[in-house]
């Protein structure tokens, strides 16, 4: 163990009190300098001059050039004075001890922590800062970059369904305890407006009317509640609307809405009346989704027993029922100018029907190898699918193409919705969280032609701009671009790079 001749160990507390802080720091600095000097003399095999390394010319300027890289050891001199020191103009003849004391004094004045090997650390930190300067700047720029979507909403209770308001920046979150939380969303922050206690059991579906005046909810308690958005009061209660738990609800216009329960019963309601307009039971299992087109002539229902059933609203009877499928029909959407109906299944398949011909599908796409439980149309030809794997995927309809991953959750996705402008998607998962995804980039997405070459494997794993994950190809593309830029600015690269 190396000891310094001037080092003294205090024998009692009085001697400790007599030691000045500057003296302690100065002594530590002297030890540091002597250890560094001995280290240099004992390790001659690492001498840069003997190794043939280039020695920087000393022009008398003690200031540090920020363009030097830490990858070269020739910039390191443990005995050199710190360039940031106010005493950098002192004569070098003062020796290592004086230099150490000066350095120690400077550390105390600058309120920096003292410690051995401080000078070398200062030089090293400076070099690291220089080398990672671009990275740090990029990180700061990413932090300061304006958000393109609202931040995540986290609840204590399980979120069963979500729905955007048609006119205002409000989203409704239904929970398993029967409450509905209304949030005002913004790219900077989300604000809880109110919590409405509507049901005694799980609220399974929540929808706004087309004009946004009323909020409709259905529940496991077999009731349908209509809440006025302005007064926040209950407008109408359909108590025991079904004999079984109600699973889904669909709003047709400002007055009409339809409901489906766990036993396969479908009912059509009018807000201006007390009772249902009609009731039909053509299925034996849970109604998974209800939908209509803009004309509101046909009401379509998918069910867990593998049927697509269509009802004629005006005639108040069943129009047609599809052939049975050996899988649950879980979701659906209308595309291509109301000419195509696409149905998602529990086996990850997508079935396409020509409008009006719902007896059997005209096309089938394998889709993804995971159950599809949710589907929302983003544009007339692009759908977003979600399910148990926690990924939201975009798919081009007719012809089918996997466009990539829109967003991710750590757990299965429970609900999915798109706002009225079609620019923002919200999704909730079994982790009791709601995440937002900006999908405005789909507006500029070109149409896909039939027989166009594509790589299905890469498409299924491709991350779109809204995704929180990046693509490996993007990283290597950036490297290639940087190399090309370097070659363009390097005259010594060859005649091919010269203008």
From Swiss-Prot:
Gene Ontology biological process terms in this record: defense response to Gram-negative bacterium
Coiled coil: none
SUPFAM superfamilies on file: WD40 repeat-like
Source taxon at top rank: Eukaryota
PROSITE patterns in the record: WD_REPEATS_1, WD_REPEATS_2, WD_REPEATS_REGION
InterPro entries on file: WD40/YVTN_repeat-like_dom_sf (IPR015943), WD40_repeat_CS (IPR019775), WD40_repeat_dom_sf (IPR036322), WD40_rpt (IPR001680), WDR55_POC1 (IPR050505)
Keywords assigned by UniProt, alphabetized: Repeat, WD repeat
WD repeat segments: 154-193, 198-237, 241-279, 282-321, 324-363, 408-447
Biased composition (Low complexity): 91-103
Location of the region described as Disordered in the Swiss-Prot/TrEMBL record: 1-130, 480-499
Positions with biased composition (Polar residues): 113-122
Name of the protein this chain belongs to: WD repeat-containing protein 55 homolog
Taxonomic classification: Eukaryota, Metazoa, Ecdysozoa, Arthropoda, Hexapoda
């Amino acid at each position: 163990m190396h000891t310094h001749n001037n080092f003294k160990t205090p024998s009692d507390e009085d001697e400790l009190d007599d030691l000045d802080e500057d003296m302690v720091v100065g002594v530590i600095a002297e030890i540091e300098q002597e250890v560094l000097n001995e280290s240099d003399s004992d390790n001659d095999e690492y001498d840069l001059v003997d190794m043939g390394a280039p020695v920087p010319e000393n022009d008398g300027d003690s200031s540090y050039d920020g363009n030097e890289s830490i990858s070269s050891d020739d910039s390191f001199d443990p005995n050199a004075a710190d360039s940031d020191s106010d005493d950098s103009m002192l004569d070098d003849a003062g020796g290592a001890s004086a230099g150490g004391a000066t350095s120690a004094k400077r550390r105390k004045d600058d309120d920096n922590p003292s410690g051995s090997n401080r000078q070398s650390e200062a030089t090293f930190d400076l070099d690291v800062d220089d080398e990672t300067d671009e990275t740090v700047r990029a990180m700061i720029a990413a932090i300061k970059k304006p958000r393109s979507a609202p931040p995540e909403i986290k609840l204590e209770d399980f979120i069963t369904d979500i729905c955007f308001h048609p006119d205002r920046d409000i989203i409704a979150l239904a929970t398993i305890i029967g409450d509905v939380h209304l949030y005002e969303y913004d790219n900077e922050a989300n604000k809880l407006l109110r919590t409405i206690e509507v049901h005694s059991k799980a609220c399974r579906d929540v929808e706004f009317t087309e004009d946004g005046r009323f909020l409709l909810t259905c529940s496991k308690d077999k009731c349908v509640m209509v809440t006025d958005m302005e007064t926040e009061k209950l407008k109408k209660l359909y108590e025991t609307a079904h004999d079984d738990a109600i699973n889904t609800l669909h709003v047709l216009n400002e007055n009409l809405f339809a409901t489906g329960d766990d036993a396969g019963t479908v009912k059509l309601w009018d807000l201006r009346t007390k009772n249902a307009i009609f009731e039909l039971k053509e299925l034996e299992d849970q109604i998974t989704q209800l939908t209509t087109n803009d004309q509101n002539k046909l009401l379509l229902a998918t069910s867990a027993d593998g049927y697509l059933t269509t009802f004629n609203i005006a005639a108040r009877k069943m129009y047609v029922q599809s052939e049975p499928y050996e899988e649950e029909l879980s979701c659906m959407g209308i595309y291509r100018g109301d000419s195509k109906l696409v149905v998602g299944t529990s086996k990850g398949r997508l079935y396409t029907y020509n409008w009006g011909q719902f007896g059997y599908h005209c096309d089938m796409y394998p889709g993804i190898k995971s159950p599809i439980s949710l589907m929302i149309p983003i544009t007339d030809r692009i759908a977003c699918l979600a399910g148990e794997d926690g990924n939201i995927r975009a798919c081009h309809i007719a012809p089918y193409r996997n466009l990539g991953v829109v967003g991710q959750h750590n757990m299965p996705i429970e609900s999915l919705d798109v706002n009225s402008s079609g620019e923002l998607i919200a999704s909730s998962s079994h982790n009791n969280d709601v995440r937002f995804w900006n999908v405005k980039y789909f507006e500029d997405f070109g149409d896909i032609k039939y027989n166009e070459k594509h790589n299905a494997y890469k498409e299924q794993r491709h991350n779109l701009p809204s995704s929180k994950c990046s693509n490996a190809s993007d990283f290597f593309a950036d490297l290639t671009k940087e190399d090309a830029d370097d070659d363009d600015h390097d005259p010594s690269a060859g005649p091919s790079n010269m203008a």
